[in-house]
C-alpha cells in the first residue's frame, strides 16, 4: 500500500462502521472518547497522537518491511561511521581496523540476505511504498555486499527499477561501476575509489573526457567535487598524466583482493 495513500484513507477510516478498524486503533479511539467524556485534556493530548501510528501498523502491509529496513540501514551506516573514524585516527585507532572491517563484512552478509529476500518477494520497492530511507537501503546493501555474482544478478533489476521510478539513477551508476571494478574493468561514472598504500585512487575511467557529463546525467556532482571528499582532486588533464600509475595501482588492488 502506498505511503501517501495511507494519509488519505486514515481520515476516511474514521467514518467506517464499528469493527472495521483493527483492535489497537479501536482501543485508542475508545480511550480518546473516555478522555473527552471526562474532560481530561492532558490524557487526551497524550493519546490521540498515537492513533495514526497504530492505524498504519495495522493497515500498511509494508510496515514490518520498513521497520526491518530501518534496522538494516542503521547497522550498515553505523559500522561505517566507526570505520571512517578509525581511518581518520589511524595512529591511535588503527589497531581496531582489521576487526572492525571483519565485523562490517559480517554485517553486510547478514544485511544483503534480508534485503534480497525482500526484493525477491516484493520487487524493488519505491519511495512511495516504503519511504526514501528504506528505498535507499535496498541499494546500499546490494552495493556493499562482497558477492560479485549477486551484484551482477541485481544490476538489471535496479536498472528496471530506475526506469519505473522506484530507484535513483545514481544507484544504478554506483552499482554499475562496482560490478565493473570487481570484474577488472574501467568504471563509467567515476563512483569507485580504492586505497593503496594509504592513498586514494580512482578506479580507472572508461571515458575520462566525458565522465562529468555522464555523472550529470545520473544526478551526480562533478567528479572533482566528489574526489575532494577523499582529500583528492580531479581534472581530465591530471588524470591522463597519472593514468598509467592509476592503472598500475588498480592491478595491484585487484591482485591483493584476489580478483
Predicted regions and their residues:
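Preference for long, solvent-exposed alpha-helical segments and helix-linker "stalks"
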Residues: 24-133, 145-148
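Extended, non-catalytic structural segments that build the interaction scaffolds
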Residues: 98-100, 194-203
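A cross-kingdom marker for long, charged
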Residues: 203, 210-259
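Mature extracellular/secreted ectodomains of secretory-pathway proteins
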Residues: 116-182, 186-192
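Intrinsically disordered or highly flexible coil/loop and linker segments, enriched in small
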Residues: 3, 18, 124-125, 167-168, ...
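Bacterial Sec-dependent N-terminal signal peptides
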Residues: 1-28
Amino acid at each position: 500500500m502506498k505511503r501517501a495513500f495511507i494519509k488519505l484513507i486514515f481520515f476516511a477510516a474514521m467514518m467506517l462502521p464499528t469493527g472495521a478498524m483493527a483492535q489497537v486503533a479501536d482501543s485508542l479511539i475508545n480511550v480518546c472518547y473516555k478522555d473527552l467524556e471526562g474532560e481530561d485534556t492532558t490524557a487526551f493530548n497524550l493519546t490521540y497522537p498515537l492513533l495514526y501510528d497504530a492505524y498504519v501498523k495495522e493497515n500498511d502491509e509494508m510496515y514490518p518491511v520498513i521497520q526491518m529496513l530501518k534496522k538494516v540501514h542503521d547497522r550498515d551506516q553505523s559500522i561505517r561511521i566507526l570505520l571512517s573514524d578509525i581511518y581518520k585516527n589511524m595512529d591511535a585507532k588503527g589497531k581496531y581496523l582489521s576487526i572492525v572491517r571483519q565485523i562490517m563484512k559480517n554485517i553486510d552478509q547478514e544485511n544483503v540476505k534480508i534485503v534480497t529476500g525482500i526484493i525477491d518477494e516484493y520487487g524493488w520497492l519505491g519511495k512511495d511504498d516504503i519511504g526514501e530511507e528504506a528505498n535507499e537501503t535496498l541499494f546500499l546493501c546490494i552495493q556493499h555486499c562482497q558477492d560479485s555474482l549477486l551484484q551482477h544478478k541485481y544490476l538489471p533489476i535496479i536498472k528496471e527499477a530506475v526506469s519505473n521510478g522506484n530507484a535513483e539513477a545514481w544507484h544504478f551508476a554506483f552499482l554499475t561501476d562496482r560490478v565493473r571494478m570487481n570484474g577488472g574493468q574501467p568504471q563509467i561514472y567515476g563512483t569507485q575509489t580504492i586505497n593503496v598504500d594509504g592513498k586514494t585512487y580512482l578506479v580507472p575511467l572508461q571515458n575520462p573526457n566525458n565522465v562529468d557529463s555522464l555523472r550529470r546525467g545520473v544526478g551526480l556532482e562533478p567528479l572533482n567535487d566528489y574526489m575532494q571528499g577523499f582529500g583528492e582532486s580531479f581534472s581530465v588533464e591530471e588524470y591522463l598524466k597519472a593514468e598509467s600509475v592509476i592503472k598500475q595501482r588498480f592491478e595491484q588492488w585487484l591482485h591483493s583482493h584476489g580478483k
